[in-house]
Structures are given as structure tokens and as C-alpha cells.
């Protein structure tokens, strides 16, 4: 009871002293809608901050640590060192993990796909350790890789001591860092095959089944939400990192230390609603769509070539702003022959005269090199004229 009273007093103090950024969260707390320790939201494409409170403060994040565990799993797959159908033997150490689990059988083989699915859906600690042992030979070495990857991503306010998020001294992160690692995880398209699962089961080798239900209730409760990770321990409180997409705009929201599960989901819903209502991504280039401009080609059967953007380019902006957005093209000195898909230059995008993005320009067609006889024919046509 004493701990509950202290927590309540801390929430009240936080509610009084935090100045909201962009969102009127102070009034929401005053109306008894719950409190939390930290919050952050951003645009996925640009990484631009939308709102935040204590987003760089150090807090335990419970099972949101598994975002980094999953990131290393999918990077292992991308590098070709792991396949989803590979069979992985669950050690006695892995099967004995406490907390959230799917009750792996020691000595039994499970597919990497099932283990990853159980991490995404059921936040399975035993599956995390099984994957850590497969990838790095042990959890300790795997945690070292987690910290190295965090450093490479610029996560300056994060330290991992395990791959599960179970309580431990010296393990912490911050809302902005959690958003950064979720953003990195979502670059792996395979992840979404698991993150959107609502209910499923894992079948153990001897036929026993463990039912699973997604701990991220936003998957069903909020239109466009298709990714995220929950977390809870007594020290961390209720946590949630989630992402939702509508149209061409994707938003990431992170809540740490909420006083209830309802609060973390309500706060996330509020963050999504605010972002989609007040911001937009203006489309500058669509991947593969030809531009009006053409690139000059030397020594080709035609003198210029149609070009297209290598990537989609959208500029994050407030719906109420009247930003001046324009682009400039810089073509390379291109000589025939040219193949469709060859890089021929770059496009630089500016917002209010400040460069905010760039993309490579690709040839949209083939251009053959002019032959000697083509040259003679062109010269003859010139003299005839």
C-alpha cells in the first residue's frame, strides 16, 4: 500500500510540473485520465518529433527491450545467417525463464518463425533467450550485441542487461531511444507478418498447444496500428511503443511508466489522433513514377532520357503551415549506352530554402549508343537540310 501511495504522489507531482509539448496532456491528467513518466511521438519517415515529455529521461522499459531483441533477429535473417524455417533447440536455461512465456520444452526443436512470433505476440521470455543463444551462443554475448547496436543507432540513453526486459539493476532506456529502435525494426518488412497477428498458438513437438493473444491491444482498437510492443513490471509500470499508418503517413508513439494499461493505450490513441489531424506528408516523388524533366545523354540514339525517383519522398509538415517546398535536379554527365535503372543523378528537396531530403534519380528507359552509320546518317540529314 505504501508503494501505491508513493506512486500516486509522484504521478500527481509529474502532472503539475510537466509542461506539455503540442498536446494538452496537463488538462487530461487533471481530469483523472491517468499519468505516466515519459512520452514521445514522431513522424516515422523523417524522425521529426511531434510531441514529448521527459523523452530523454532514464527509466526501466520492461519488455520493450524485446524490440532490440527482435531487431537483431531480423537483421540476422537479412544477412542470410538465419532462416525463418530453421529449427532451434530450446535449452533448459531458455525453457526455465520466468515472466511472460510460451512454456518451451527443454531439448525440443522449434522453428525460428514460431519463436519470433511468440516474442511479437506473447512477449515470450523463453523464446527471447532461445533466439539469443542461437544467434550469439548465449544471452550475455547477445546482450553485448544489443548494446553495440544501440550505440550504432545513436541510442545514447539506453543500456541493456538482458534480452527480455526482466527487472535488473542498471538497465534503462528513454522514450526517444525506444522510438528509434522501433523505427529501425519496422524497416524489416518480414516483421509485419508477425506484428499484426491478434491471436495464434504455438504447437509443441509432443502436440501440446499454447494459445497466444497479442498484448498490443491497439492492433485491433485503432485503425492503422500494425506494430508495437508492450511492457510491464512493477518498476517500469505500463509501457507501450506502437506505430500506426494512415495514407502515406506513419506515426510512432512511446509511453513509459503509465499507471494502468488503459492509460498507456489512451495516451497512444490520443497521440495518433493528434498527429493525423494536424500533420501530413506531402508527396514530392513517388518511387518509379517518371518526372517531367529529362536527363541529357551524350552519344546516344536519343539525346535525353526519361528519369524516375529511386525512392518515395514525402515531406512532413503541419497542415496549417504554408511551407515553400521545391526540388532541384543535378544530372551526371551520362554517356550511352544507358540501361533502365542506371543512376543518372540526384534530386535535392528543400523546405523553406533548407535541404531536407534527397533521392537518387534512375534512368526510366534504355538508350543505345549511336553507331558509326547512325552518325553518318545524322550528318547527311544535316547537310540535306
Regions found by a protein language model. Give the residues of each.
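Hydrophobic alpha-helical segments and their boundary regions
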Residues: 4, 9, 36, 88, ...
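A general lysine-centric signal
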Residues: 2-3, 66
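Sec-dependent N-terminal signal peptides of Gram-positive bacterial secreted proteins and lipoproteins
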Residues: 4-26
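Domain-terminus/edge residues, biased toward the C-terminal soluble/receptor-binding domains
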Residues: 155-156, 167-172, 176-385
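Amphipathic, positively biased hydrophobic alpha-helical segments used for protein targeting
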Residues: 18, 58, 73-74, 80, ...
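Active-site-adjacent loops and short helices of periplasmic peptidoglycan-processing enzymes
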Residues: 20-189
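Hydrophobic alpha-helical membrane context
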Residues: 15-16, 78, 279
